[in-house]
Amino acid sequence: MRFLIPLLPEVAEHWAWFVVTMALISIFYGALLALMQINFRRLLAFAIISQTGLIVIGLFDFNTYGMEGSIILSVSFGLATAGMLLSLGMIYKRTHTAFIPRLGGMFDTNAAIAVLFVICALSTMVMPGTPGFDGIHLLIEGTIKGQGWLVAIAILFGNVLTVGLLLRAFQQIFIATPRRSQEPFANTRHASSLPSPRNEWIIAIIICGSLIATGIHTSPWLHIIDQNIDSISNVYSNTGTHYPDTLTTQPIISKDN
């Protein structure tokens, strides 16, 4: 958005159909592959691929709503992904395994890790009260205007898959009982014997608090974003591509910033 769309608007619009098609494929491809994983690292990696497709579609809507939604989702997914990676790292530190069938029942003694994972997962699911909710609302509105109803509906179905895979991962890791024997890991420290220390609670509170605070009070973020993307979104009109004479001299970021 900082370089391709302002510098090459004709090229961006000409290839928008291809980019949006590949983004839609990545949404479903990443989500379906994530559902098939039994390694939580690979699961999260494919889930990130799926969510990246949403951001790309918003950028190529070529309107203010879509671009605002993409930026808000970028912030939301960045915080949420960091939180989930951190929680999974804590799990691996305890169990020395990333194999989901060997995990389970970790909520009772590792509540901080569970709370961190579920709040970040809810933000990735774009639930109300998280920044992802406002971001997906703007993204869908921009997609309806820029790409049409079919693409917007496809985005919603892709998000349903993301909800399913993250809830399934939470259930298998933190609630369900292990489906495989722990014998190969008998010499390692099991998660149930290591309750969450104070520093893990502090980290969980900071990340979860940032997500919730950003989700409840999104207006300042939108105000900052509006100042920086107006010069980009105004390049395009609803009836076609319009290139104002000031495009080459208008700064992408206002001087007030």
Identify what each model region corresponds to.
Residues 110-112, 168-257:
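Cytoplasmic/organellar membrane-interface segments at the starts of transmembrane helices
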Residues 1-137, 141-171:
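Hydrophobic transmembrane alpha-helices and their helix-loop junctions in integral membrane proteins
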